[in-house]
């Protein structure tokens, strides 16, 4: 019975890796389409969202099967519950990747070069967030606590990139009002990448829960207020 359960857990890991791969392709194709203003490629990138949604349903069904048929012990139950939470965030990442490609289509006639918008920051955000998504899934599959925490800490880098990009755009709008609409659209693109980073962080936090039984926020509270926890003021969940 346990061997069968372990095989199904391995299948779950493989399905999560496949979902992560679909998201990676959607983001990479989306940023390529954005930079090159390639509408056809953007339309292809949007199609990944359908595959991501289907993969979410596949994983959800597998998790329910594991819960109903295998009667998992506490540790396994945490792992399956975390996977169910993770795929919700992964599906939202797929949505945001599609949103970025839709913005590319919307801005098809815009002149990036004339607007002097710094596309390097956008490309860096795409690289960072893609890395976060892939590593968060790897952390789950390999039960790698340190890698999950690396992903969480990396979110600050994405936030800093977004803040600097936003300030730069505001300055450009003030200098040239004509570029205001395009700057606003590009800010939305940056915001979508920032949200992808947030969802990758959520995934990493669920990885930590699956390993430790504690959510990252609770672990932080325990470090900050060890006395309160010893006195029973912070309860185990």
What do the PLM-derived regions correspond to, one by one?
Residues 1-237:
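Cytosolic, long alpha-helical scaffolding segments
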């Amino acid at each position: 019975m346990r061997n069968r359960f372990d095989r199904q857990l391995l299948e779950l890991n493989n399905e999560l890796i496949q979902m992560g791969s679909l998201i990676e392709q959607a983001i990479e194709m989306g940023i390529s389409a954005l930079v090159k203003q390639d509408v056809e490629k953007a339309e292809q990138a949007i199609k990944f969202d359908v595959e991501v949604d289907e993969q979410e349903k596949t994983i959800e069904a597998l998790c329910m099967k594991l819960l109903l048929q295998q009667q998992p012990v506490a540790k396994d139950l945490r792992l399956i519950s975390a996977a169910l939470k993770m795929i919700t965030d992964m599906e939202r990442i797929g949505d945001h990747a599609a949103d970025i490609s839709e913005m590319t289509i919307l801005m098809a006639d815009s002149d990036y070069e004339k607007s002097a918008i710094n596309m390097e920051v956008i490309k860096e955000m795409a690289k960072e967030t893609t890395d976060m998504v892939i590593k968060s899934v790897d952390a789950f599959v390999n039960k790698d606590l340190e890698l999950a925490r690396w992903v969480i800490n990396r979110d600050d880098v994405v936030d800093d990139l977004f803040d600097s990009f936003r300030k730069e755009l505001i300055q450009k709008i003030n200098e040239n009002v004509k570029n205001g609409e395009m700057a606003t659209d590009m800010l939305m693109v940056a915001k979508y990448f920032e949200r992808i980073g947030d969802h990758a962080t959520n995934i990493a936090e669920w990885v930590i829960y699956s390993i430790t039984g504690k959510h990252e926020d609770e672990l932080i509270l325990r470090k900050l207020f060890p006395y309160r926890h010893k006195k029973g003021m912070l309860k185990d969940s």
